[in-house]
A protein has these predicted regions:
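Conserved, well-ordered core segments of regulatory domains
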Residues: 1-7, 64, 83-86, 144, ...
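Hydrophobic/aromatic-lined pockets within catalytic cores
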Residues: 51, 55, 74-78, 94, ...
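Acidic/histidine-rich catalytic cores and adjacent linkers
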Residues: 115-232
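RNase H-like nuclease fold core
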Residues: 1-62, 67, 71, 76-79, ...
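Amphipathic alpha-helical transducer elements in NTP-driven molecular machines
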Residues: 12, 40-44, 63-70, 99-102, ...
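Flexible, active-site-adjacent loop/turn segments at secondary-structure boundaries
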Residues: 3, 19, 28-30, 53, ...
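Conserved beta-strand -> loop -> alpha-helix junction used to position metal-binding or nucleic-acid-contacting
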Residues: 60-67, 72-108
């Protein structure tokens, strides 16, 4: 979220950014655009733009609980699964937990995602819900019960990928770098100025080792698809 001047007032402006891992396993920056706010209309326009530029074969979309993005993704990339970032989800649960209980609850939540497979994770989630209710953390228990499934999509992918596809930490690091570079400006004269500076920073990142180092072994995906075809 950046600030820009509009009719003499300083207002917030959102920049929507998308990165991806390509078919060879390397990270790419797909695009950036200005959005008045992170709603479905803004994300739909952005995803439509990316799809129009040739984005296809999307298998998994990772984000925080941005319903505008989740809904738009289902419309433009219906074949893709949605993975809710477990880090953001943990923080959401912690917001309903007393500070004295956060460490205990954190261990409970991490135990869910330490499961060896989807079945084990679901079974652990049931136990966590019971424990939270036993601690009278009703709201936290309800959040786990209603939303934990959104954090388990990564189990459908190779185990070697799990740690890197269940959070949107790679994007968060990029956004922090953009905020660091733009903070010195304060309020931009217009949205385009903010967009230009952010895009320049993204181009710089794309030219570093960030995009030259293989992030995922995508051969594992091909092996998984082949095994599935044989089983079917």
């Amino acid at each position: 979220m950046l600030k820009r001047c509009w009719a003499g007032e300083v207002r917030n402006v959102s920049l929507l950014v998308a990165i991806a891992v390509n078919g060879e396993g390397y990270r790419e920056i797909l695009g950036i655009c200005e959005g008045a706010k992170e709603d479905k209309a803004g994300w739909s326009a952005f995803l439509k733009h990316l799809k129009g530029r040739g984005l296809h074969g999307v298998r998994l979309i990772v984000s925080d609980a941005c319903m505008g993005l989740a809904e738009s993704a289902a419309e433009f990339f219906p074949e893709a699964a949605w993975q809710r970032c477990i880090v953001h989800w943990y923080r959401n649960v912690f917001s309903h937990v007393p500070s004295t209980k956060v460490r205990e609850v954190a261990a409970m939540l991490k135990a869910i995602h330490a499961g060896e497979d989807l079945v084990a994770a679901r079974q652990q989630a049931v136990r966590v819900i019971e424990k939270l209710r036993g601690l009278r953390l009703t709201t936290a228990a309800e959040l786990v019960e209603t939303a934990v499934e959104e954090t388990l999509a990564y189990y459908a992918f190779p185990e070697e990928h799990w740690r890197r596809i269940r959070t949107n930490n790679p994007l968060e690091r990029i956004l922090r770098e953009i905020r660091r570079r733009t903070r010195v400006v304060g309020a931009f004269p217009d949205g385009q100025s903010a967009l230009n500076l952010a895009a320049a920073r993204l181009r710089h990142i794309a030219g570093t080792a960030w995009s030259n180092k293989r992030y995922l072994n995508t051969e594992l995906l091909k092996d998984q698809q082949m095994r599935g075809a044989i089983t079917a």
